[in-house]
From Swiss-Prot:
Organism: Yersinia pestis
Entries under InterPro entries matching the protein: Ac-CoA_C-AcTrfase_FadI, Thiolase, Thiolase-like, Thiolase_acyl_enz_int_AS, Thiolase_AS, Thiolase_C, Thiolase_CS, Thiolase_N
The keyword Nucleotide-binding is assigned to this record: no
Reported function: Catalyzes the final step of fatty acid oxidation in which acetyl-CoA is released and the CoA ester of a fatty acid two carbons shorter is formed.
Disulfide pairings: none
Annotated gene: fadI
Chaperone as UniProt keyword: no
GO biological process, one term: fatty acid beta-oxidation
Superkingdom of source: Bacteria
Name recorded for this polypeptide: 3-ketoacyl-CoA thiolase
Length: 436
């Protein structure tokens, strides 16, 4: 174990998360059809400020992320500041780390607080899979640029005459990795085969996720952290996540065909997280600032770590690389954790990471450690369900997990929690949270 790395300011203040909030998450082209991510971000930040009871003038900075970016609003963070009545002097910038984007936003805010450059800030993310940047072909794009420089109508017509019919077709956003051409689901399939993750085990984890998420909603455990959303034309309220299958069965899951490897695969729509719309944010500040404002902490950020690995194989093992670092920096072990929350991009990816957590061979050969961090106690794992059930608005998932874990730790009387996620590009994130 390496030496602990305390997350404190020069005055010894810890990093406080005062509050966290998210919109209900909705499957693509359902409740938020036509609502761009920037509007979802404005909705959640406005409500977070209202619930926190502090003046927006006190917010020094807003760090926000969006993975599927819209060309007309490339800096979503600044647009949220300008669209929510916050001070125009509030600093704002956007970040992107694929599925770990709001983890990055939280880390950036923490570093700014530690450096003393800000006292109070908001971190979060929003994504819409329903409002997408539909592009044009490279041939048409080049022609449009050239036509803009053409001096006469005849020159423009000559340029356009070279185009073929297929060049005029719209181009949807890529779903594959830019560097490899592999889809995330392809990597999930590879990991399932490499690590012997059966279809039955994947379906069982997916069912567990939906059952626990349904129970969390039924018991009212999520009501304080999920706002009611109203969107144009304001005819009805959006109250709950709409992806959770409250009465599904393994028999139903077993009927689905593989989604990626049609002949020999095991990854299906049921044991994968769906395309989702939503937003989430957290309010952060130094411990002394929270005390001065009379704001009780929801919890503390104890440590964080990011990792980067190969993209050709095992690209979704980021949690297995980032988690040991976060544990070391917090000065704790896996056994010290009260809760463990791992992003469920795919059941196969989740189960593969759990295997690597417990693998001494992986620890020695990949991490250079003498032994594994340990086997996960499933009674601590994703106790309210995970992304397979809730959905995955890419940039919002980290903030959802952080808020959900802190609230559940508080409900249980305190303790330490791990939140961790894989991300496209072979990236990983892990954070240790504490509730007293």
């Amino acid at each position: 174990m390496s030496k602990p790395l305390p997350l404190v300011t020069r005055q010894g203040d810890r990093i406080v998360i005062v509050n966290g909030l998210r919109t209900p998450f909705a499957k693509q082209a359902t409740a938020y059809h036509g609502v761009p991510a920037v509007d979802l971000g404005k909705i959640v930040v406005s409500e977070l400020l209202a619930r926190s009871g502090i003046s927006s003038e006190l917010i020094d900075q807003l760090v926000f992320g969006q993975v599927v970016q819209m060309p007309e609003a490339p800096n979503i963070a600044r647009e949220i500041v300008l669209g929510t009545g916050m001070s125009v002097h509030t600093d704002a910038y956007s970040v992107s780390r694929a599925c770990a984007t709001s983890f990055q936003a939280v880390a950036n805010v923490a570093e700014s607080i530690i450096a003393g450059s800000v006292d109070i800030a908001i971190a979060g993310g929003a994504d819409s899979s329903s409002v997408l940047p539909i592009g044009v072909s490279k041939a048409l794009a080049r022609t449009l640029v050239d036509a803009n420089k053409a001096r006469s109508l005849s020159q423009k017509l000559k340029l356009f005459s070279r185009l073929r019919l297929r060049d005029l077709l719209p181009v949807a956003p890529a779903v594959a990795e830019y560097s490899t051409g592999l889809r995330m689901g392809d990597t999930a399939e590879q990991m399932a085969k490499t690590y012997g993750i059966s279809r039955e085990d994947q379906d069982a984890l997916a069912l567990r996720s939906h059952q626990l998420a349904a129970e969390a909603w039924q018991q009212g455990w999520l009501h304080d952290e999920v706002m009611t959303a109203y969107i144009p034309p304001y005819r009805e309220a959006i109250i709950e996540d709409n992806n959770i299958r409250k009465d599904s069965t393994l028999a139903q899951y077993a009927k689905l065909r593989p989604a990626f490897d049609r002949q020999h695969g095991s990854v299906t729509a049921a044991n994968s997280t769906p395309l989702t719309d939503g937003a989430a944010a957290v309010l952060m500040m130094s411990e002394s600032k929270a005390k001065a404002l009379g704001l009780p902490p929801l919890g503390y950020l104890r440590s964080f770590a990011f990792s980067a690995i190969d993209v050709w194989q095992d690209m979704l093992l980021g949690p297995s690389y980032a988690t040991p670092l976060a544990l070391d920096r917090a000065g704790i072990t896996l056994a010290d954790l009260t809760l463990i929350d791992m992003h469920e991009a795919f059941a196969a990816q989740t189960l593969a990471n759990l295997k690597m957590f417990a693998s001494d061979t992986f620890a020695r050969e990949k991490l250079g450690r003498s032994q594994a961090i340990g086997e996960v106690d499933m009674s601590k794992f994703n106790v309210l369900g995970g992304s397979i059930a809730y959905g995955h608005p890419f940039a919002a998932t980290g903030a959802r997990m952080i808020t959900q874990t802190l609230n559940e730790l508080r409900r249980r009387g305190g303790g330490l929690g791990l939140t961790t996620a894989c991300a496209a590009g072979g990236l990983g994130a892990a954070m240790i949270l504490e509730v007293e």
